[in-house]
Structures are given as C-alpha cells and as structure tokens.
Amino acid sequence: YEIGVRLVGSEMCIRDRRMAIEADSTFGEPYATAGMKGLAAARAIGLLSYRGPEGYDLSQQDENDDFSSHRACTYQQYQGEKLCRRYNAYSYYKILNAFDTHDVGYQRGGVAAALQRITAECLVVGISTDLIFTVPEMQALHRMLPRSTYHQIDSPFGHDGFLVEHEQLNRILNPFIHPTHE
C-alpha cells in the first residue's frame, strides 16, 4: 500500500512515469528544456490514473471518429503542454522519485510503528474510484492510525474526486476542522 507510506507493485507500475521521461532522447542533456516531450508523455500517463475510466467517459465523450482530434486525446496533449510550462523534466523526475520511494516506516520500526506515534486526531478520506490511493489502502491507513476517522467520497472521477466533489469533501472537512463541543 502507498498511503503516503510505500507502494504496492501495481501502483509502482501506474506511477512509474519516469520511463516516459527517460525515453525522451534529450533527457540528460545539460539544458533546462531537455526531456520536455517525455515530460508531456509522463503527464498524459499520470492523468489516466488521476481521472480513471468513469471520469473520462463522463467528461471526454466525443462522437468524432478522428482519433487524433478526440477530446480525450487533445485533453491529454493540452495537460502535457501545460505541465511543460510549469516544470522542467528534471524537477518532475525528482518529484516522482520522491513520491515513489517515500516510506514513513523507514528507520522507524516499520509502517505500523511509525503511524502509532502520531498523537493528533486524523481524518482519512477514501474516494470510491481512486486508483492512486484506493479505498482498501485508505481503510488500512485508518486502522493503523491510533486516533482517526474514516469517510468515503463517492465519485466517478477517481483521484481527482477530491477536486471535483468539493461539496462532499466540505461536508466531511467542516466538522473535522470546526468541531462542535457538546
């Protein structure tokens, strides 16, 4: 499980966008714009796990038979270009590496021992279709944290559900942030 802790094998495959960056023949060259085609491809790959199939079906439907101008394809291209304006391939590569190798249990007696040290009240939110932080992983995190509450958001938008389903999220967050003491 990842849960901000470590990655399961299937998640490592989904998140390994570094391969796309490394496949760009300019990556490794000593200039800031090197690896940009790979960066755009990495973003497109990442989007598939952020949004998920249901979210794409709802937001990117198209009657057009021309694959190259299909809404889903042009959306992927646009998002790749947008990321290239904000990052360079080297910084994104380093961020991906940090995400993929983070393990809160490292040198802390393992994941469970590290999480048991947390004394704060925690809120864990799962999203029904999230492929990055799955519901079983979020439920496992909830069980490992000594003082946590679990809620679930139902959304067809995968990991992006936390951005799209703001009304559901607000109903969960507001009582946690502003508790009423009776």
Predicted features and spans:
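Single conserved hydrophobic/aromatic residue that forms the stacking wall/gate
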Residues: 1-9, 13
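Flexible loop/turn segments at secondary-structure boundaries
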Residues: 10, 101-103, 131-134, 158-161
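Alpha/beta-hydrolase-fold enzymes
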Residues: 10-82
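Active-site nucleophile elbow and catalytic-triad environment of alpha/beta-hydrolase enzymes
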Residues: 78-79, 94-114
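Short alpha-helix in the alpha/beta-hydrolase fold that links the catalytic acid
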Residues: 107-111, 120, 131-143
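Short beta-strand/loop motif that positions the catalytic acidic residue
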Residues: 118, 124-126
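Catalytic active-site module of serine/aspartate enzymes centered on a nucleophile-bearing elbow/loop
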Residues: 139-140, 147-182
